[in-house]
Regions:
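Positively charged, aromatic-enriched patches within helix-turn-helix-type DNA-binding elements
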Residues: 2-42, 46, 50-59, 64
Length: 71
């Protein structure tokens, strides 16, 4: 849950920009940790589900071959 919060906080403070998975991993989890880039996919999916359940007026947009952006 804390990681989801940090991920959401990162995107909310950097809206409208596309970020690659590796950059997101470095900024949210730290550069000193080795995690698969698909970890980001899992956490973004969880946040998407929670935001949709709340009918939030924001969304994560997947940019194929690049990463994600938050609108």
């Amino acid at each position: 849950m804390l990681t989801e919060f940090r991920l959401l906080q990162f995107f909310m403070t950097h809206p409208d920009f596309v970020y690659g998975r590796q950059h997101i991993l470095d900024m949210v989890w730290g550069r000193d940790r080795y995690l698969d880039e698909r970890t980001v996919n899992t956490y973004v999916r969880r946040l998407r589900n929670k935001l949709e359940a709340m009918s939030a007026d924001v969304e994560f947009v997947s940019v194929r071959g690049v990463g994600y952006m938050f609108l």
